[in-house]
């Protein structure tokens, strides 16, 4: 996890630490930082380490995990996600607000997009589940 952390935070940010306490117990934390973004970063780096170091064929992440992580770090993560294909592995990523990122990040996203969902006809299964009249039913 430290190697990945050093890639996404080259300015020497503390990396998460995994402590195996027993065969049924562990902790994963970043020393001196328990913010939401740091916790999400720790989970992402753990997932990437497992993806890169084991036979696990794929991981899936949602945009919520990236929402509290800096743009620079997110763009570095996108590159790490992309490099996983060199290992014949896949990353499934639900990503929104792509326009907020650099042209390079958007190019990387475009090259790797398999499915793009949006309103007005690009909904999964062709319909938006949240449209319709409100009901008083509970």
Where are these regions (language model features)?
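Alpha-helix C-terminal capping segments
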Residues: 18, 49-54, 81-85
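Flexible loop/turn segments at secondary-structure boundaries
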Residues: 34-36, 67-68, 99-102
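Walker B catalytic acidic pair
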Residues: 62-64
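Amphipathic coiled-coil/heptad-repeat helices and related helical stalk/stem segments
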Residues: 43-44, 74-77
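C-terminal lobe/lid and adjacent interdomain/linker elements of RecA-like ASCE P-loop ATPase modules
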Residues: 77-138
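GG-anchored amphipathic helix commonly corresponding to the ABC/SMC/Rad50 NBD signature/C-loop
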Residues: 37-58
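Conserved ATPase-coupling elements of RecA-like P-loop NTPase cores
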Residues: 68-74
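Extended helical coiled-coil dimerization/tether regions that scaffold
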Residues: 1-34, 105
